[in-house]
A protein has these predicted regions:
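Juxtamembrane intracellular "pre-TM" segments in multi-pass secondary transporters
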Residues: 18-29, 220-244
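Cytoplasmic membrane-interface "Motif A"-like loop-to-helix N-cap segments
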Residues: 93-107
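C-terminal membrane-cytosol helix-exit motif in multi-pass small-molecule transporters
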Residues: 175, 179-184, 205-224
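Hydrophobic core of transmembrane alpha-helices in multi-pass small-molecule transporters
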Residues: 113, 124-140
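Cytoplasmic helix-loop-helix junction between adjacent transmembrane helices
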Residues: 135-166
Length: 244
């Protein structure tokens, strides 16, 4: 019993030492930073963006019941489109030469959409831009997650991934605090609340893009499959077989 207890204590000490000594590489840090960027967008969407849409909808004569329904419809459209595009994007993420370019495309769609939401003059235009931006964000995550195998080793994946998750939560608060202070104190600086919300969206978009730059600079695709004929169609076939 004493020997088993000693081995367990030794194993715990070794695991603790490994955790304490764990340091991320520059490439791993660049990958983690993308979570810091896109999490700021998610936090903005969950908090301040509905206020912006609410104001636009009321200005457009839309009732409270209707604008809540429209917001739900927009979120549902994003979910359905993302689900349909998922197999296509997943196939492209595994194919040689596609991962980084399409990741950048999705990133720029999300970032530009985030900025453009603040420029929308009507609730309908806002919803259309919101849908496009959210699809861009969701698409980027497909490629971002698939990058982990190129960024680190299998033994380090869990640690790197968990740090991305944690840093994302913490880092997203930085621009959010600035944006929240701007919106709440908009009258003190001579801005309307709508103008402050528009600026907050731009701040979030800039944050998202800037913290992603290290990943765009450092990332190189290592693991891939060669381009195959009918690869996308085969992806849907495999999904159909799985569902059966």
């Amino acid at each position: 019993f004493k020997k088993r207890a000693a081995r367990r204590c030794k194993g715990k000490r070794e695991n603790t030492m490994k955790t304490e000594k764990f340091k991320v590489t520059p490439l791993e840090r660049a990958w983690i930073l993308y979570d810091v960027g896109n999490s700021a967008f998610v936090l903005m969407i969950a908090t301040l963006v509905p206020i912006f849409f609410n104001a636009l909808a009321e200005a457009g004569g839309v009732s409270k019941v209707d604008y809540l329904a429209y917001w739900g419809y927009a979120s549902s459209i994003v979910t359905v489109v993302t689900a349909i595009l998922g197999p296509i994007l997943g196939t492209l993420a595994d194919t040689k030469g596609f991962k980084k370019p399409i990741f950048m495309l999705c990133l720029f769609v999300g970032v530009i959409g985030c900025c453009a939401m603040g420029l929308a003059g009507t609730w309908l235009a806002f919803l259309v831009i919101f849908i496009i931006a959210k699809i861009g964000y969701s698409g980027s995550l497909v490629f971002y997650d698939s990058m982990l195998g190129d960024v680190t080793t299998p033994e380090r994946m869990d640690m790197v991934s968990s740090r991305g998750y944690a840093w994302g939560y913490i880092g997203s608060c930085v621009p959010f605090v600035v944006c929240l202070a701007l919106v709440l104190g908009s009258s003190a600086v001579g801005l309307s609340q709508m103008t402050a919300l528009s600026i907050a969206l731009v701040i979030t978009a800039v944050w998202w893009l800037v913290v992603t730059l290290p990943l765009l600079k450092k990332y190189r695709q290592i693991n891939y499959v060669e381009v195959e004929q009918h690869a996308i169609r085969q992806s849907f076939v495999r999904i159909g077989q799985t569902l059966k």
